[in-house]
Amino acid sequence: MEFRFNMHPLFRARIVRINNSLLPTGFVAQSRRVALDATAQISEIINTIGSMSAQAQGLSVPVTTAQKLRNSDHHIYLMFESNDRNGLVVGILKVGRKSLYVFDPSGETVNVTAPCVLDFYVHESRQRGGLGRELFEHMLREENIQPDELAIDRPSEKLLGFLQKHYGLSKKIPQMNNFVVYEGFFASKAQNSTDIDGRRMHITASPNTNLFGPTFTTTEERRRSTSQTRTNVAPMPIIAQPPVGRYAAKRPTCSMAQVNHYSSMVGKISFPEENTGNGKRSVFEEQELDQRLADEMERCVELGAGGDEPDASRYTPHHGLEVKFADQPETLPYDDMPEPGPDPDPYDFHPHHLELHDDTEGGGSHRDQSLSPQSVSQQASPVHPAGSDYGVLGSRKPARYTKQNTGLKNISFGVGAAVMPSGKMEFDQEENEGFGSVKINRPIGKSGTRGSLHDDNESVHSNGSQQGGGGHFDLKFYHNKLW
């Protein structure tokens, strides 16, 4: 495969070996910039050849990339073919050591670290020309290994045929993974049998095998577990260290014992010990003790429920803590309380209640006299007959119907008569009395018409005035012209 850059400076030999430094062995860079350029070029070559190898084997993900090589201790062998231009890369072989769990010929699981062939590819235009065998032989010489010592990772049919044709490897040992090993894989390691025996795995016969899978133990571990010559090692003394931090904080005591209100009282009940001669109570003594305990429990319950009359002095409040207000009425005992009298008649306010009579002149109308709102409100309040039978407490003032009792919270009783013009009283205001003067009056210039309401006064009518005579006016409409 040809690339866009000149590869002759990178390949000083026909086959070069590349490690995780991404530089060919024996490559000497003149400067740091040259080394970085060489690394970038080798990375491009490895990525391109790895993609072509994965495509030829039918793999979805390339096995060989520059990033994977940088993060591992594997090696890549690249075969180069020079020409008059930039040169050609015709083959790649990736090898490395891996720790594998494989089955030996007897069926036992062995953990070995063996050299593996991870990727092998020769360009289609150079196949069946001996280039693959040349590359493979060079790798065997560099790694100093034999073909039967190799574990092949996911070999294709072409690779299996290549190994059988050139090295006579045909007898495979079935494995539980994707690696293929041959019979010579374990025979070549017979001289180092102690290392293999030490790492030979055995499946333990445990009842948890069906649940959690088989458990593997090595021969050395089994030998140590079954050995009788082991000396019992004294266990290390346990040193209790005091807790520190939040673990040393005091815990709150449990309050479950206080749930039962009588647990403290019952716990204090004690009975004299009446033992027989042999140190044990008789049946009659046990029954008597149970009866006494039940009686004591019943007495405690009666005390808690208020069955016995407690001492009145215990519940008498201290006189120094009693507080009595000045306007607080004097309370009478329940037996000395008089019967409540009949309820007072409901008071209805009407404008004609405000008619004032002159005692000196014989009852003439006070049209010329001034009437203040205070006097109107005083006359509008109902007067109840005095007597001790009114109400429960004699010293209580007579009840009045307030705005809260009648539901008319926005209605003023004493102002209704002053606002509403009638034949009994009139207010004429012809001149402006200045800022801050508040008077309730009809519009200026309408003093001649009596008993009629102007349109300007309609906005101050409350809902109660729509029911007929004696309506009230709401004084909260400050935007009205009257204010």
Curated annotation (Swiss-Prot):
Protein name: Alpha-tubulin N-acetyltransferase
Listed GO MF terms: tubulin N-acetyltransferase activity
Similarity field: Belongs to the acetyltransferase ATAT1 family.
Compositional bias segments (type: Low complexity): 370-383
GO cellular component: microtubule
Known role: Specifically acetylates 'Lys-40' in alpha-tubulin on the lumenal side of microtubules. Promotes microtubule destabilization and accelerates microtubule dynamics; this activity may be independent of acetylation activity. Acetylates alpha-tubulin with a slow enzymatic rate, due to a catalytic site that is not optimized for acetyl transfer. Enters the microtubule through each end and diffuses quickly throughout the lumen of microtubules.
Biased composition (Basic and acidic residues): 347-369
EC top class, as a word: transferase
Record key words, sorted: Acyltransferase, Transferase
Organism whose genome encodes this protein: Anopheles gambiae
GO BP, sorted A to Z: microtubule cytoskeleton organization; neuron development; regulation of microtubule cytoskeleton organization
Keyword Transferase attached: yes
Region (Disordered): 204-231, 330-395, 437-472
Enzymatic reactions: L-lysyl-[alpha-tubulin] + acetyl-CoA = N(6)-acetyl-L-lysyl-[alpha-tubulin] + CoA + H(+)
Annotated site residue numbers, Crucial for catalytic activity: Q57
Domain N-acetyltransferase: 1-186
CDD domains registered for this protein in UniProt: NAT_SF
Coiled coil: none
EC number: 2.3.1.108
Keyword Ligase among record annotations: no
Positions of acetyl-CoA binding: 120-133, 156-165
